[in-house]
Amino acid sequence: MTLATKLFGTTVLVLAFMVGCSPTGYDAWPEQMETFPWVYTPDPDRPDFVDGRWETEDWDFDDGTRSGYYLEKLLNYYKTTSPEVSEHFTRVQSSIPTLGEGVVISFVGDLLPIVDNHANFADAIVDVVSADYRVANLETPTSPGHPIQSSGAPPKFNEPVELLDGLPFDLLQLNNNHSYDVGDEGIAATKQEVLARGMETTGLDEHALVTVKDTQIGFLSYTWGLNGRDDVSTHELFIVPFGHIGEDIDLSTMGTQIAAMKERGAEYIVLLLHWGFEYEYYPEPHFMQLARRMVAMGADVIIGHGPHVVQPVEVCWVNHPDQVPGVGNCSIQTSDGRARRAAIFYSLGNFTSSIRSPAEFETGIVGRVSLSGGDVTGLGWTPISVKYDPTEVVPTDDNLDDANFAQESERLNSHLGAAWRLP
């Protein structure tokens, strides 16, 4: 036997030993606190106006510097992020499954005040939001006993009840930062008006358990606060201060309520979250950490809104040991061991708007999720935009003669991924 042969044989044995000793499955996973999104590089291009972030309980327009930053962010948008966040959302696009079999639910974001055409503004997107069940965030009271309003700093809203007449939805989320704009009587009256029109509600005193095609789905909704109101509502609005960056946010009540919803028979858990810093293209890693904790507590779908701009989407693998967590992969291990996937839409953007520009503010998405066999089987998205005189929500594809909307449509293709876009 030659020396070369001996060396080759030894090398093969060493490599075989190394492969045999390499960690596999969960043994290959890094410690959670030592990997993305807990570990990341700060945005090197972070503009100063990001210091104009507001948390809902501390609006203070007497602070001139902070107010100036806030207005600058409104005009320019925070478009960059951590390098790892950007890379992550680019890489996850290829792992998002297209809409599949099972129960299909559609979601839209913030239904904000409009100036006219209240009863018919949504006629053009009835087919776009079509699904087995349709959900929206009603970000304004509709109390007939209070004046119509949309002013102040921060603004207080109240819309005509006719706004509810033409809504193509089955469930409205009522808890967000504008829930208390006309007080307890106003939010209670809003709920009555919604129910009177045959829609269901969630987020005011109770969460919703609904049956869709013989499948029980729990819709639990939470808001990160009210707009700096000193009064305390007598209603339960399910407030969780999601925006306290750097703090260990207490999600124990949410976990208890998820468990209780499952005890009631929910086969899927959908969380509707009014959260996130306004006018920012990407979620802060803080919110990505929270979302992973919620998925670990049992969430199958997380639907976010509040930033008034569309943010990226990801699918999380639950109890898939071959899916190692990190940049480009959301993966979670839970004690029940049941393999599944969960969907996270960080922000759907606006559904309606009365601010005529920029295109990011006037454009949101209809998000869709398909559920079957205890799993998320697929996702889809369709962009929608607001037109004026009269106010009308239309498919963005019908607005492509407008260069701003055409540009925004292309940006969303890149931001979300075109492969799972729906017409």
Regions found by a protein language model. Give the residues of each.
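Short acidic, glycine-rich surface-loop motifs adjacent to enzyme active sites
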Residues: 133-144, 176, 257-282
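Active-site neighborhood of phospho(di)ester-bond hydrolases with catalytic His/Asp-centered motifs
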Residues: 107-110, 133-139, 167-177, 200-205, ...
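A short C-terminal boundary segment appended to hydrolase-like catalytic domains
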Residues: 25-102, 261, 334-336, 356-423
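Conserved beta-sheet core of the metallophosphoesterase superfamily
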Residues: 169-171, 283-365
